[in-house]
């Protein structure tokens, strides 16, 4: 079973470009972390200020480790949150078939 994170970020009006830049910085770094199985961001074509991040980790601890990395702390908590109107994070586990 993998641990899944589905996050939705909605940028404040006029701030979508800042969020896109943060995602472009974080994605390649995050993909290299131990325990990261998949990490991909999407943007809504109908609502370009709305972003969806789909992430898979080996387990919940790998996700906690991700949130505690220097780059996550700096770019998300130290920067991106200032430009977000909304941020939701939901977690799931895969169903092995």
Short names for language-model regions:
Residues 93-97:
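Short hydrophobic/aromatic patches at helix-to-coil boundaries
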Residues 14-15, 45, 72:
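Alpha-helical structural elements of signaling/regulatory helical domains
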């Amino acid at each position: 079973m993998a641990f899944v994170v589905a996050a939705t970020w909605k940028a404040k009006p006029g701030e979508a470009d800042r969020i896109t830049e943060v995602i472009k910085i974080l994605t390649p770094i995050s993909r290299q972390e131990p325990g990261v199985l998949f990490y991909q961001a999407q943007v809504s074509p109908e609502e370009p200020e709305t972003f969806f991040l789909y992430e898979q980790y080996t387990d919940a601890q790998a996700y906690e480790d991700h949130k505690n990395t220097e780059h996550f702390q700096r770019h998300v908590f130290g920067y991106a949150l200032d430009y977000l109107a909304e941020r939701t994070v939901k977690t799931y586990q895969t169903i092995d078939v």
